[in-house]
């Protein structure tokens, strides 16, 4: 009897945990189509209509972003990569596209450097230099923006940024508004 009671209690607890997790996930809004399509177009320069069709087909934003990266790296149309992905797992898709981890990483690096240059007008060679030093593209962008407002070099600003030290805090230490690294 005790075992049955314990088993029922565990099952009920499991239902509450699963139900609660589902409810919180259900409250999460999906990515707005226009925002998703515009963002991916700005990043990868693929056709907005084509991206919209793929988004409408039920592909999640993150999956579509991954499709774009692979298409960019392989220099193939996004729809062609999406058709491969419908049939195969990513490792097989990469093989069929001739993408090695190194080629994919190189293409991702190139796309990020190009994107920052196109969208923010930052020097491509400098962005590339700092990203090759292991800094994330958003850190490089913010340090380059911030360097315009103070007497510190980009290298010095990147050195100030740690996981604990936020960009807004660095701006304040330099006597600048918290958002100085954003423009």
Residue spans of the language-model regions?
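Short, intrinsically disordered, low-complexity terminal segments
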Residues: 18-23
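Bacterial N-terminal signal peptides
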Residues: 8-17
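Positively charged n-region of N-terminal signal peptides that target proteins for export
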Residues: 1-6
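A broad, structure-centric signal for solvent-exposed, well-ordered loop/edge residues
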Residues: 7-8, 71
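General marker for long, soluble alpha-helical cores
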Residues: 24-183
């Amino acid at each position: 009897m005790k075992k049955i009671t314990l088993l029922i209690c565990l099952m009920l607890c499991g239902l509450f945990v699963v139900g609660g997790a589902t409810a919180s996930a259900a409250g999460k809004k999906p990515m707005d189509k226009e925002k998703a399509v515009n963002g991916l177009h700005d990043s990868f320069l693929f056709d907005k209509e084509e991206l919209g069709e793929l988004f409408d087909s039920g592909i999640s934003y993150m999956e579509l972003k991954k499709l774009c990266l692979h298409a960019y790296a392989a220099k193939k149309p996004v729809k062609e990569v999406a058709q491969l992905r419908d049939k195969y797992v990513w490792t097989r898709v990469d093989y069929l596209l001739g993408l090695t981890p190194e080629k994919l990483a190189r293409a991702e690096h190139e796309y990020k450097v190009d994107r920052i240059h196109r969208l923010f007008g930052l020097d491509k060679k400098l962005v590339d230099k700092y990203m090759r030093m292991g800094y994330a593209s958003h850190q490089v962008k913010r340090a380059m923006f911030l360097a315009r407002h103070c007497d510190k070099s980009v290298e010095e600003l990147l050195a100030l940024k740690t996981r604990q030290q936020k960009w807004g805090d660095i701006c304040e230490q330099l006597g600048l508004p918290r958002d100085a690294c954003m423009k």
